[in-house]
Amino acid sequence: MNGTEGPFFYVPMVNTTGIVRSPYEYPQYYLVNPAAYAALGAYMFLLILVGFPINFLTLYVTIEHKKLRTPLNYILLNLAVADLFMVLGGFTTTMYTSMHGYFVLGRLGCNIEGFFATLGGEIALWSLVVLAIERWVVVCKPISNFRFGENHAIMGLAFTWTMAMACAAPPLVGWSRYIPEGMQCSCGIDYYTRAEGFNNESFVIYMFICHFTIPLTVVFFCYGRLLCAVKEAAAAQQESETTQRAEKEVTRMVIMMVIAFLVCWLPYASVAWYIFTHQGSEFGPVFMTIPAFFAKSSSIYNPMIYICLNKQFRHCMITTLCCGKNPFEEEEGASTASKTEASSVSSSSVSPA
């Protein structure tokens, strides 16, 4: 084995010289330069500085403006709530441990950080599944006269949290476990060991099949069918120009969220699977640290995509920030009016980008 395994940790360094210490008790500066830990702490501070205000603003603006409280936006708000959980429960913990160079908060802190990071990522993934299914049903119309309503949105929310908990909670109760990873200042699922009594192998396989491969397959199927339907509708001119534009722009926004999710999480998932299938092989602490911390940036991309691509939300946000007045009223107001008209015509009954 090209690492050192101990009680509830795995350090990617062979302890031939006796230098390796528990990441819960001692700084891990023998792994990388101390400056790297300072850089990680600064990075986490930046994510908190950006992630908390932008996600909180997304929630506040939607609550403040009644016209934004549409069923589809319930799912988008669900992403903001999940991101806030990651920021408050995970990022603050990781920033603090990075500043100390080891997981100074112990096993409890490791469980909290690992749980919130996993929960947030899974809520994002399953929310994208619900959005993809909604787009497919509304645009492709496999169910005639279907209208995505408030009850469907609430069921979608319950589904995303149930599935996310089914992935994030088991390591807390003994099916696998959360341990420090990479530079030992953030925690994740134990892909590294076959520790007796934790059944890591079965959990990792379960997680990759049920909580990564299957949801992504559903997403790709829905959007594959959706893109074909949009092209066919455009060619046949079956819908009004306003409705087609509305559906296309909502679809574009959700597809951008899927692409951003893959950019953030696919490197982490790929490295995790490689480590799991090559347990005992040699890899450095940075090998897992970079994709793990890159994945954490997912907390800011959803609201940014939403703000950039949804003119109605952007108009409401500017109005809120400017104390009820929009200095770009003429430009934004005209766009919002046209989008609101599109919303009333659209069979999805949403306020699209």
UniProtKB/Swiss-Prot annotation:
InterPro entries: GPCR_opsins, GPCR_Rhodpsn, GPCR_Rhodpsn_7TM, Opsin, Retinal_BS, Rhodopsin, Rhodopsin_N. GO terms for molecular function: 11-cis retinal binding; G protein-coupled photoreceptor activity. Keywords: Cell projection, Chromophore, Disulfide bond, G-protein coupled receptor, Glycoprotein, Lipoprotein, Membrane, Palmitate, Phosphoprotein, Photoreceptor protein, Receptor, Retinal protein, Sensory transduction, Transducer, Transmembrane, Transmembrane helix, Vision. A motif ('Ionic lock' involved in activated form stabilization) lies at residues 134-136. GO terms for biological process: absorption of visible light; G protein-coupled opsin signaling pathway; visual perception. The keyword Transmembrane helix applies. The record marks E113 as: Plays an important role in the conformation switch to the active conformation. Residues 331-353 are annotated as: Disordered. Pfam families: 7tm_1 (PF00001), Rhodopsin_N (PF10413). Residues 62-73, 134-152, 225-252, 309-353 are cytoplasmic. Glycans are attached at N2, N15, N200. Residues 1-36, 97-110, 174-202, 275-286 are extracellular. A lipid is attached at C322, C323 (S-palmitoyl cysteine). The chain crosses the membrane at residues 37-61, 74-96, 111-133, 153-173, 203-224, 253-274, 287-308. It is found in: Membrane; Cell projection, Cilium, Photoreceptor outer segment. Its main location: membrane. The keyword Transmembrane helix applies. One of its GO terms (cellular component) is membrane. It is a multi-pass membrane protein. Phosphorylated on some or all of the serine and threonine residues present in the C-terminal region. Contains one covalently linked retinal chromophore. Disulfide bonds join C110-C187. Residues 334-353 have a biased composition (Low complexity). PROSITE patterns: G_PROTEIN_RECEP_F1_1, G_PROTEIN_RECEP_F1_2, OPSIN. Photoreceptor required for image-forming vision at low light intensity. While most salt water fish species use retinal as chromophore, most freshwater fish use 3-dehydroretinal, or a mixture of retinal and 3-dehydroretinal. Light-induced isomerization of 11-cis to all-trans retinal triggers a conformational change that activates signaling via G-proteins. Subsequent receptor phosphorylation mediates displacement of the bound G-protein alpha subunit by arrestin and terminates signaling. Belongs to the G-protein coupled receptor 1 family. Opsin subfamily. This is Rhodopsin. It comes from Diplodus annularis (Annular seabream).
